[in-house]
């Protein structure tokens, strides 16, 4: 089929007209150049990717579709199965492998990076890579993976990169042009559904919350200015101000923040449901759901409640009664039946998936969510509300950035269902509305690199390239591209970081000049932020002669990171002696001592590595943290979820089921990596047993891809 015939057939099959930016992007795809599309959430970027995938299928070339999150990969897998048929689509997410040799394979970006570093034979007929959510390139922990993929993918492979709106798309395109060849940059700034910004406020003495326009075109609305002025006048007469009058005579402020039930009732009156309410605390999300239940709010009809129950029961068939009890399932499903839910990383993945399915089917009126939802699965709503316009960071409480505001409000407005989307900011007495307006009207933020050479990456460069070529690979990074354009006094070549890591590897015996030792070859296959420490621990025999559960516990020290060690320690001290003794007996004191001794060995190794790193000014990896060890060991020995969560409360402070599952999954991933090292026969076999012991019940449920009904 000719290009024009295919294009015509594709567009006619959509049943709706395309926007100008989509037509321009499709034309660029047909010219067989790389394409970068920067457009608002919901604008239809995915359509460009679907067109490019179809063209590759016509040419009998494979496509890899990468996403930053397993949840997004699962969602995209289902979408592409519906488009092209399940026989032509596969899924690879590290813990899930479906039809891996398919013509179109969806995967997390790390999976593709690992394929490139191991020179997988899966790459032989690869024609196209779709990099979805390429703005993750700036993620401080994982963003470097996107650059590694763009640099290392064979030159013949083309890219379609999809990004949320960024301010420096042209600059990013210039870099892509250098590392990937001819690249067309498509920028769309207009939202497909117009966004209206509002303020939710309670007037003193009024019974109902009010929703007012925040903006009038490119400026603050008259009502917003009036609220600001009245609050400014009020503050002059409030305690703590410079006014010298009597505190008792100060009038109450004219406005206050609406309570959660008041906000929901106002949104329902204004026909602004369903809504996602962003709250920057998991506990506050849970509290919000509890408050609405306590206040008796109900947004569903009987037939909707029955459908919600059916969705939840079908997803949780494999969960035991004890697990459901530990997860407080009864409270969760009662809220769902009312059309109310929460969505955050503290929930087990199965519960989050139930919320997503119910919301997708328009069965929920409100979801209280942390901002991770804005970065995750596609879940648009008619409205988005922000309970506060500030959040805590390392620098204290700060305003949301324009990028954060745009990311969250990008969920407002459902294409095909809503003519307009609505963003509602809840009033706060310490919030000036002109600050909200300034952020809402700010241009898109620029994208910046977070790439830094790791030990694993350096080892793979040594293995694959000569010294000069390896330097060139690092110099081709977006980080170096940005660095080269800074003022002369502020530049530091990234090659210096790679060279420093090479010196560390030489001193520790992983490299002899520009050649890897057997230990260096081992390091190449470890994909983790503690890659060198794990390799050193393997070489020292720390993982030998352990039972599977103890090995899982030991590996957790590379995964787990105490949020506040002091708080966890205090929490453990407050647990009764009786409760502690019960946990120790269940685990077995002898087993516990075995893990503790090995943890000491790892800490000694860590200190040695740090001394070498300090000499070469290499940033340290995270400290090993053994607080999760006895918890995951108990789980691997068959303890129930309730027992393990009780143990976690005693050992490290209150732990959510979602946090437990996430850490357990990461331990299982490390077990899988050790299990693939067949030259370590005994350790590899035990590691695979440990993986299987960890991947059960709710943890295994997080790995499952469930078909859509």
PLM ranges: what are they?
Residues 1-35, 216, 220, 300-337:
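Helicase-associated low-complexity/disordered flanking segments
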Residues 8-11, 16-201, 274-279, 286-300, ...:
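Conserved P-loop/Walker A NTP-binding site and adjacent catalytic elements of P-loop NTPases
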Residues 157-158, 379, 383-439:
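Conserved segment of the helicase C-terminal RecA-like domain
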Residues 350-359, 449-554:
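C-terminal accessory/connector segments of nucleic-acid motor ATPases
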């Amino acid at each position: 089929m000719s290009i024009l015939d295919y294009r015509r057939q594709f567009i006619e099959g959509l049943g709706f007209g395309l926007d100008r930016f989509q037509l321009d992007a499709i034309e660029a795809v047909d010219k067989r150049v790389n394409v970068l599309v920067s457009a608002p959430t919901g604008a239809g970027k995915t359509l460009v990717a679907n067109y490019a995938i179809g063209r590759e299928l016509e040419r009998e070339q494979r496509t890899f579709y990468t996403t930053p999150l397993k949840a997004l990969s699962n969602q995209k897998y289902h979408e592409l199965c519906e488009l092209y048929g399940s026989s032509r689509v596969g899924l690879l997410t590290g813990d899930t492998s479906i039809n891996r040799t398919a013509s179109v394979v969806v995967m997390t970006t790390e999976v593709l990076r690992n394929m490139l570093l191991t020179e997988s034979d899966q790459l032989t007929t690869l024609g196209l890579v779709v990099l979805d959510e390429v703005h993750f390139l700036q993620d401080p922990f994982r963003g470097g993976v996107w650059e590694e993929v763009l640099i290392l993918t064979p030159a013949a492979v083309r890219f379609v990169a999809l990004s949320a709106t960024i301010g420096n798309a042209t600059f990013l395109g210039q870099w892509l042009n250098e590392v990937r060849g001819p690249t067309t940059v498509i920028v769309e700034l207009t939202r497909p559904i117009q966004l209206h910004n509002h303020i939710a406020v309670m007037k003193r003495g009024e019974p109902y919350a009010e929703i007012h326009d925040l903006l009038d075109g490119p400026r603050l609305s008259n009502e917003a200015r009036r609220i600001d002025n009245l609050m400014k006048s009020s503050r002059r007469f409030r305690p703590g101000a410079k006014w010298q009058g009597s505190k008792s005579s100060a009038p109450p402020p004219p406005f206050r923040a609406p309570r959660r039930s008041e906000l929901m009732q106002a949104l329902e009156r204004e026909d602004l449901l369903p809504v996602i309410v962003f709250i920057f605390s998991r506990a506050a999300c849970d509290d919000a759901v509890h408050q609405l239940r306590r206040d008796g709010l109900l947004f569903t009809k009987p037939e909707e409640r029955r459908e919600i129950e059916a969705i939840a029961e079908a997803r949780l068939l494999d969960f035991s009664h004890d697990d459901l009890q530990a997860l407080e399932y009864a409270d969760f499903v009662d809220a769902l039946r009312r059309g109310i839910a929460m969505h955050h990383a503290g929930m087990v993945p199965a519960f989050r998936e139930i919320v997503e399915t119910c919301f997708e089917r328009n069965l929920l009126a409100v979801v209280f969510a942390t901002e991770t939802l804005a970065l995750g699965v596609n879940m648009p709503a008619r409205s988005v509300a922000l309970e506060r316009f500030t959040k805590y960071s390392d620098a204290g409480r700060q305003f949301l950035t324009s990028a954060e505001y745009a990311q969250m409000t990008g969920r407002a407005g459902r294409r095909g269902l809503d003519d307009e989307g609505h963003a509602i900011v809840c009033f706060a007495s310490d919030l000036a509305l002109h600050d909200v307006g300034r952020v809402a009207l700010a241009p898109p933020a620029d994208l910046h690199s977070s790439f830094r050479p790791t030990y694993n990456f350096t080892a793979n460069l040594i293995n694959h390239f000569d010294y000069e070529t390896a330097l060139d690979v690092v110099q081709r990074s977006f980080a170096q591209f940005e660095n080269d354009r800074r003022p002369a006094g502020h530049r530091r070549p990234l090659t210096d970081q790679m060279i420093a890591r090479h010196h560390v590897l030489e001193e520790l015996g992983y490299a002899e000049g520009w050649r890897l030792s057997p230990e260096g070859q081992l390091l190449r296959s470890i994909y983790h932020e503690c890659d060198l420490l794990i390799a050193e621990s393997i070489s020292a025999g720390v993982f030998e002669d352990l039972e599977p559960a103890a090995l899982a516990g030991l590996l957790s020290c590379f995964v787990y990171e105490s949020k506040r060690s002091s708080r966890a320690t205090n929490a453990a001290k407050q647990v009764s002696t009786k409760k502690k003794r019960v946990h120790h007996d269940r685990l077995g004191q002898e087993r516990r001592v075995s893990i503790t001794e090995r943890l000491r060995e790892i800490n000694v190794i860590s200190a040695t590595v740090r001394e070498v790193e300090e000499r070469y000014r290499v940033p340290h990896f995270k400290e090993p943290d053994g607080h999760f060890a006895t918890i995951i060991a108990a789980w691997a020995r068959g303890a129930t979820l309730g027992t393990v969560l009780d143990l976690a409360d005693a050992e490290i402070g209150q732990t959510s089921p979602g946090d437990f599952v996430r850490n357990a999954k990461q331990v299982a991933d490390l077990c899988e990596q050790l299990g693939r090292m067949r030259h370590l026969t005994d350790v590899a076999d035990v590691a695979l047993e440990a993986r299987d012991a960890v991947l059960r019940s709710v943890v295994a449920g997080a790995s499952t891809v469930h078909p859509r009904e």
